[in-house]
């Protein structure tokens, strides 16, 4: 085992990376409220794991979506637990994200030189809200259907581009299979990918610039 570690250490300098991570200075004013971003990340990872597990059973069609969710909840092994954890962690992620934004704002974390960190954080907050909107529709029950109809109908009030934008979101003039397919693709591929990209931008900047000062 030691030889295997030495082989990787010689090529990747694992110990130097570990020392850099563990030796980072933590200001004395840091408290539990500075952990809200990390908790949000943890919730996101739980979402990825549980969401991936549900893709084995979920069917993104208007005729089978609701039945597949019922199958997950009643027949799939531990399906009820996986979906429940997914829902609970989704609510927790949104709550922690909101509290994290407030904490950063109150402590001046958006000021120079952390402007870009703040911008990427705001984008991540928007992506988090988008997860909620798209995920809410996937069971394709009455609540999900009408929520999608209302949300996708909002841009219709915008002059000139409103109607084309509604059709782009829905995939057609009315809510249906094209809408569910779009929302499923957004929820399971586009949004997770964008979130991962912006997280990979967000965290190195925090690492480089450090934590903002106290109130």
Swiss-Prot record:
Matching Gene3D superfamilies: Cytochrome Bc1 Complex, Chain C (1.20.810.10)
GO cellular component, one term: chloroplast thylakoid membrane
Keywords: Chloroplast, Electron transport, Heme, Iron, Membrane, Metal-binding, Photosynthesis, Plastid, Thylakoid, Transmembrane, Transmembrane helix, Transport
Pfam families: Cytochrome_B (PF00033)
Single GO molecular function: metal ion binding
Cofactor binding annotation: Binds 2 heme b groups non-covalently with two histidine residues as axial ligands. Binds one heme group covalently by a single cysteine link with no axial amino acid ligand. This heme was named heme ci.
Biological process terms in GO annotation: photosynthesis; respiratory electron transport chain
Binding site for heme b 1: 100, 202
Keyword Heme belongs to the record: yes
Cell compartment(s), UniProt: Plastid, Chloroplast thylakoid membrane
Binding of heme c, residues: 35
Listed cofactors: heme b; heme c
Superkingdom of this protein's organism: Eukaryota
Biological role: Component of the cytochrome b6-f complex, which mediates electron transfer between photosystem II (PSII) and photosystem I (PSI), cyclic electron flow around PSI, and state transitions.
SUBUNIT field: The 4 large subunits of the cytochrome b6-f complex are cytochrome b6, subunit IV (17 kDa polypeptide, PetD), cytochrome f and the Rieske protein, while the 4 small subunits are PetG, PetL, PetM and PetN. The complex functions as a dimer.
Protein name: Cytochrome b6
């Amino acid at each position: 085992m030691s030889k295997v570690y030495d082989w990787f250490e010689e090529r990747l300098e694992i110990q130097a990376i570990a020392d850099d991570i563990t030796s980072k200075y933590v200001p004395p004013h840091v408290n539990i409220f500075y952990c809200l971003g990390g908790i949000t990340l943890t919730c996101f990872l739980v979402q990825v794991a549980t969401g991936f597990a549900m893709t084995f059973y979920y069917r993104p069609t208007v005729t089978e979506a609701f039945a597949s969710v019922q199958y997950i909840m009643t027949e799939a092994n531990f399906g009820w637990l996986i979906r429940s954890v997914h829902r609970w962690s989704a609510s927790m992620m949104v709550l922690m994200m909101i509290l994290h934004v407030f904490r950063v704002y109150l402590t001046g974390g958006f000021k120079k030189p952390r402007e870009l960190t703040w911008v990427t954080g705001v984008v991540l907050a928007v992506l988090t809200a988008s997860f909620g909107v798209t995920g809410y529709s996937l069971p394709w029950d009455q609540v999900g259907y009408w929520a999608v109809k209302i949300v996708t109908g909002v841009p219709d009030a915008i002059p000139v581009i409103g109607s084309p934008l509604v059709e782009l979101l829905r995939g057609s003039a009315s809510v249906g299979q094209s809408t569910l397919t779009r929302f499923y693709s957004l929820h399971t591929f586009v949004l997770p990918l964008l979130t991962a990209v912006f997280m990979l931008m967000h965290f190195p900047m925090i690492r480089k610039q450090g934590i903002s000062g106290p109130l």
